[in-house]
Amino acid sequence: MLGQDALAAPTPVAASEAFFRSLQPFGATYIQTRAYRRPRARLTSDSHWSAGGFILRYAPDGWVDSVAFDYVCFENNPLLDAIRLGQTCYRFSDFAPRNRRFGRYWEALAEARIHDALCATSYGAAGAIASLHLGFGDGGLGPDEARAIQMAGLLLTERLIGFGLPDAPEGPRLTPRERDALAFVAEGKTDWEIATILGLSESTARFHVDNARRKLGAVNRSHAVARLITERLL
């Protein structure tokens, strides 16, 4: 079975290395594996990178931290859409078609000898994500072959999640009243309207909103609503 050695490997690094070795005869030239937790903040190139969890990256000398590397990782990273959509199997070219718009993107990847890349991603509890990016130096993989490699990749990413991740950091704890009051702020309600809906005095409604804002580390109510959304509390 393709990638079978990875399943018996004792560590995430060993599993990733074994998987890459098994795919090199198929033309694999690049690998990156990660196991991390999805950022609580809005998903951007920076927050995605800061989530860490890098296990193995094999690339040509000098490409990592090059201008080309920074471009595909930070300046123009279309693969964030795959995470937003919860995609498990895809190619880089599914999100970055080979057209004029993404010309510079593919030029940057070519410096790492990546003609295209196959991806497999597993999603676990508490925002756990394990991902595989496997680059190939030419476009010779047919659809059936690519699909078989992606299925094997999912076995690897499930194995990586199985090794375990650090506990998720605990988010702000809002009381049910604080959460409800701020949710009504998100709907554009005034303190008086919130008080009427919740059966409270106006000053008590304001108290709950202000408490929620402070717990979320927000500078004003609009900021608090944004934090409520990014913390997935709404």
Q: Which residue ranges define each predicted feature?
A:
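A short, hydrophobic, proline-anchored segment that marks a local hinge/packing element in signaling
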Residues: 118-125
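Basic, Lys/Arg-enriched C-terminal extension of HTH/homeodomain DNA-binding domains
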Residues: 214-234
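Regulatory input/activation interfaces that engage signals or partners
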Residues: 5-6, 18-118
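Juxtadomain coupling helices with adjacent low-complexity linkers
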Residues: 1-5, 12-13, 136-175, 183
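Residues within the DNA-recognition helix of helix-turn-helix
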Residues: 208-211
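Helix-turn-helix DNA-binding segment
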Residues: 163, 167-204
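Glycine-rich acetyl-CoA-binding "A-motif" of GNAT/NAT acetyltransferases
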Residues: 128
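Short beta-strand-to-loop transition segments that serve as allosteric relay/switch motifs
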Residues: 109, 131-140
